[in-house]
């Protein structure tokens, strides 16, 4: 292994090295300090006479006389079934006090986006136990469905609840969760670890924790380690894997930080111009492959700076993914948990995973009717603020009351409350029964006769 002593410049986490031989992109590098200590890095960029290396830890102690060895290998993740139940650092090292992972394979962390021709269409419903997701913005196996949140909102709690409760109802196949947190505080890391251990969810999970004081470079690697692990569990072991990535905003900030250190020409709001491509290289690793048993489903979580849904991170994520779940500051102020606003939320693949043979025949109609009724009631709140409640017609008051009922009964649920899809749909019918039957214009008459509490109870009484 040839050793160079031609370090030209050090800038933040980057080391610039003069070279005379071809060096591979993303090649692993060992930097040897004067005392023999070795720091690892990766080739970020290469030109005719210069190589840019990003160091996985601080560059403290690296000098122009330090030795640089190019290994000729890329980063590989040691993977195996024994990873389930383990908590790892953002660089894939065990931090739970357990033994080192004995790898069954070592896989390149860059992976590969699934060939579009090899993709199978998502069609299986994933039950999260949260009514606003299951009932109105359904998650489908193989989908990538982000959560858009804001600073100070309980997206971490929502992420933990999904990680704990997610399952494919009626399936006998194994289900696993890969949870990767990026740029979190030590307090948040402790909270995540304690909740996984308290609830027993850790048994079927692999957890990666990258802390805020860890190098920015590690934040770029963490989601790739998580997705490589998920792909192994899904496509080698045949498991259904849900990958939760939080917080993608911290990931993008790390991209911006490294881009600034490389003196790149910035794009929108200082983020690199290639951020769209970079995010796509992560999100497109979700899906189902024809002929394979397993699947990878993604829920990336991001905090929108200033609650701005047009911010580049949210904007680009929305282009690549298949919908969004929006966490509302207004609902959070009302003390409602989980504060998911169904009106701007959307699951583009919802119709593929609901209905007869998937959830229940009335699912789509109930969802559409609740959405329409809540939207109308929510609009009436603005009118009430101007003209007062007394100026409303009897019909309008009914819809206004439905909006309050929807938020307090359907949206609101406990942190440990796990509702089945049947519970969610039955609750939806219960709320819709507060509206006159003639106002249920989006539901077929035969479904009303079968599921509406008024007719359902009357039918049961007649049978007796």
Swiss-Prot record:
UniProt xrefs under Pfam families: ATP-synt_ab (PF00006), ATP-synt_ab_N (PF02874), ATP-synt_VA_C (PF22919)
SUPFAM superfamilies the record matches: C-terminal domain of alpha and beta subunits of F1 ATP synthase, P-loop containing nucleoside triphosphate hydrolases
Protein topology in the membrane: Peripheral membrane protein
Subcellular location: Cell membrane
GO biological process entries: proton motive force-driven plasma membrane ATP synthesis
GO molecular function: ATP binding; proton-transporting ATP synthase activity, rotational mechanism
Single GO cellular component term: plasma membrane
Keywords noted in UniProt: ATP synthesis, Cell membrane, Hydrogen ion transport, Ion transport, Membrane, Transport
CDD domains: ATP-synt_V_A-type_beta_C (cd18112), ATP-synt_V_A-type_beta_N (cd18118), V_A-ATPase_B (cd01135)
Signal peptide (from-to): none
NCBIfam families, alphabetized: ATP_syn_B_arch, PRK04196.1
Complex formation: Has multiple subunits with at least A(3), B(3), C, D, E, F, H, I and proteolipid K(x).
Assigned protein family: Belongs to the ATPase alpha/beta chains family.
HAMAP family assigned to the protein according to its UniProt record, in alphabetical order: ATP_synth_B_arch (MF_00310)
Function: Component of the A-type ATP synthase that produces ATP from ADP in the presence of a proton gradient across the membrane. The B chain is a regulatory subunit.
Protein name: A-type ATP synthase subunit B
Lineage: Archaea, Methanobacteriati, Methanobacteriota, Stenosarchaea group, Methanomicrobia
């Amino acid at each position: 292994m040839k050793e160079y002593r031609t370090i030209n410049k050090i800038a933040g986490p980057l080391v610039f090295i003069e070279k005379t031989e071809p060096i591979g992109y993303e090649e692993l590098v060992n930097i040897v300090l004067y005392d023999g200590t070795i720091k690892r890095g990766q080739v970020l960029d290469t030109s005719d006479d210069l190589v840019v290396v990003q160091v996985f830890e601080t560059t403290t102690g690296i000098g122009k006389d330090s030795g640089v060895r190019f290994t000729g290998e890329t980063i590989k993740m040691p993977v195996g079934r024994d990873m389930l139940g383990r908590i790892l650092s953002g660089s894939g090292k065990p931090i739970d006090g357990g033994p080192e992972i004995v790898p069954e394979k070592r896989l390149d962390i860059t992976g590969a986006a699934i060939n579009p021709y090899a993709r199978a269409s998502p069609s299986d419903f994933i039950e999260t136990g949260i009514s606003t997701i299951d009932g109105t913005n359904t998650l489908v196996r193989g989908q990538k469905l982000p959560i858009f949140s804001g600073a100070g909102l309980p997206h971490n709690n929502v992420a933990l609840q999904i990680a704990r409760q997610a399952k494919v109802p009626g399936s006998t196949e194994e289900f696993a969760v890969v949870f990767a947190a990026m740029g979190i505080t030590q307090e948040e890391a402790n909270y995540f670890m304690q909740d996984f251990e308290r609830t027993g969810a850790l048994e079927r999970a692999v957890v990666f924790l990258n802390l805020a004081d860890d190098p920015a470079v590690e934040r770029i690697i963490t989601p790739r380690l998580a997705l490589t692990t998920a792909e192994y569990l899904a496509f080698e072991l045949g498991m259904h894997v849900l990958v939760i990535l939080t917080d993608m905003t911290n990931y993008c900030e790390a991209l911006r930080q490294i881009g600034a250190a490389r003196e790149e020409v910035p794009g929108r709001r200082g983020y690199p111009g290639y951020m769209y491509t970079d995010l796509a290289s992560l999100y497109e690793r979700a899906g189902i492959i024809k002929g394979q048993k397993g699947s990878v489903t993604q829920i990336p979580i991001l905090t929108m700076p200033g609650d701005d849904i047009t911010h580049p991170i949210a904007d680009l994520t929305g282009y690549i993914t298949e919908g969004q779940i929006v966490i509302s500051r207004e609902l959070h102020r009302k003390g409602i948990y989980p504060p998911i606003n169904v009106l701007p939320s959307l699951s583009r693949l919802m119709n593929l995973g609901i209905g007869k043979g998937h959830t229940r025949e009335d699912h789509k109609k109930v969802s559409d009717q609740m959405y329409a009724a809540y939207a109308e009631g929510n609009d009436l709140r603005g009118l009430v603020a101007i003209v007062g409640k007394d100026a409303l017609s009897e019909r309008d008051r009914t819809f206004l009351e439905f909006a309050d009922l929807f938020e307090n009964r359907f949206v609101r649920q406990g942190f440990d409350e796990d509702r089945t899809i049947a519970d969610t749909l039955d609750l939806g019918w219960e709320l819709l029964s507060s509206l006159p039957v003639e106002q249920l214009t989006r539901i077929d008459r035969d479904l009303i006769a079968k599921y509406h509490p008024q007719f359902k109870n009357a039918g049961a009484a007649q049978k007796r």
